[in-house]
Amino acid sequence: MKTIATVVLVFAMMIAGAVERPRLDVYPVKDGRAIVALANEHPAMFVVSLNDQEGTLVFHRESKESQTGYRKLFDFSGLKDGRYELSVKVNTTTVKKPITIQQGTLNVGESEFRFDPYFTWSGNVLKISYLNFDGDPLRLSIDGEWGNLYDASLGREFNTMLGYDLSALDKGNYTVVLSGGDKQYVYHLKK
């Protein structure tokens, strides 16, 4: 049991060390405007999105080249009162910041981090690790060239670490899909 706990701890530390740690700040200035600033340790491509409380996309921008920072003055004055979510995706890390607009005043909440799952394929074993911050019911499916081979509900556990021995599968291309809530992560492997 001690060995398993050590392996899990080492695996979790490897994942934590491999992800980006971008910093997202929103500084309200005046008249419904705010400076949005992103800083990242390493140059990377990123996607900035702003969604309203219904999930409707209000703003979207993808970087055209890798960079370590982004700064833009946003004008929120034309938006209706309500809750919004500003998110920035840098590689496999997403930083979310809730923003509430009420009578032209911006209130900015704390940053929340989300990480894409980690997939690895080696020696006929598929390993998956995922931190389910939102507590969504998770589902895993494995599809081959001939259709669905495996489909299972994984529950709502926060820390999901799985290993699948796929040695019995024929050679070919396979698609692994981990989904939960409105998120879907796809991993392709060739056996």
What are these regions (language model features)?
Residues 1-23:
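Bacterial Sec-dependent N-terminal signal peptides
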Residues 19-26, 102-118:
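Short, compositionally biased P/S/T/A/G/V-rich stretches that sit at domain boundaries
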Residues 44-46, 136-138, 174:
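Short beta-strand/loop motifs in extracellular/secreted proteins, especially
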Residues 52-57, 84, 143-149, 174:
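Short, glycine-anchored, charge-dense loop/turn motifs used at functional sites
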Residues 65-87, 156-177:
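Short, surface-exposed loop/turn motifs with a glycine/proline- and acidic-biased composition
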Residues 90-108, 117, 180-191:
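C-terminal tail/sorting-segment detector
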Residues 118-149, 158:
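Surface-exposed interaction/gating patches
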